[in-house]
Amino acid sequence: MNNIIDGKALANEILADLKLEIQELKSQTNTSPKLAIVLVGDNPASIIYVKNKIKNAHKIGIDTLLVNLSTTIHTDDLISKINELNLDNEISGIIVQLPLPSSIDKNKILSAVSPSKDIDGFHPLNVGYLHSGISQGFIPCTALGCLAVIKKYEPNLTGKNVVIIGRSNIVGKPLSALLLKEDCSVTICHSKSQNLSSITSKADIVVAAIGSPLKFTTEYFDPESIVIDVGINRISGNKIIGDVDFENVKSKVKYITPVPGGIGPMTIAFLLKNTVKAFKDSYSTVCHSCL
């Protein structure tokens, strides 16, 4: 169906542009962006995600460093390792693969990453920039991917009613800030919201991001709505499904993203785009400091 949004194709366009940009940057600087990925433990899903990030990074000319640590590591020791990466001038961007073991203080770890290398956009300083409307720092990649998809299919967002189901720091909160900047009327709902279908069925755009498999069926959506499914739910081994009942909903809405193949590839594309931005920012800083 031509109303199914091909996130992989959109992501490939971004990656192709990034590859050319990296080639140009390398010719100018004789160096390449480098992404450090901190992986604690051996969570199977995390390992898959990390391998995918590394594969896509290498495809477009971004070097990578995988720092794989034991689940027994203490918060302070992990912070020390992150500080080493912060001080390494060869490292452009740093991501800490989530989730972390429960024994580790996640907030302390995310705050330990230098804001200038925080390409996930999770450091409190970068969060503050976004919610203050300051065009500086980094924005969470999934939120950027969602916005790019939405704007591709609805270029004029002024006055559009958008419902975001989910209030996470990764999707719901940052995406709401981005959409407010686009002059949308944004409603944030969550798993405790009442009469949810009566809210979502009036929306022009619905973003589902609560991690509840196939929860949202046809009665949740207006026939002219755009549906963005950010849910990633693993069932029956490695099979992944979204929060939206895709098979039944896809013919009942204007546009819809599938899972997999929708927002996932866009998230990786914007992660790498942020890596290139961090590289350019750091190189610009070095050049200016030499003047």
From Swiss-Prot:
For this protein, the parts annotated as crossing the membrane are none
Q: Which CDD domains match?
A: NAD_bind_m-THF_DH_Cyclohyd (cd01080)
- Which residues pair up as cystines? none
Q: Which Gene3D superfamilies match?
A: Leucine Dehydrogenase, chain A, domain 1, NAD(P)-binding Rossmann-like Domain
Binding residues for NADP(+): 166-168, 191, 232
Which branch of life, at top level?
A: Bacteria
Q: Which InterPro entries match?
A: Aminoacid_DH-like_N_sf, NAD(P)-bd_dom_sf, THF_DH/CycHdrlase, THF_DH/CycHdrlase_cat_dom, THF_DH/CycHdrlase_CS, THF_DH/CycHdrlase_NAD-bd_dom
Transmembrane is among the record's keywords: no
**One Gene Ontology biological process:** tetrahydrofolate interconversion
For this protein, the record's PROSITE patterns field holds: THF_DHG_CYH_1 (PS00766), THF_DHG_CYH_2 (PS00767)
How does the record describe its quaternary structure? Homodimer.
* Annotated family: Belongs to the tetrahydrofolate dehydrogenase/cyclohydrolase family.
- In Swiss-Prot or TrEMBL terms, this protein is called Bifunctional protein FolD
Protein's organism: Rickettsia felis (strain ATCC VR-1525 / URRWXCal2)
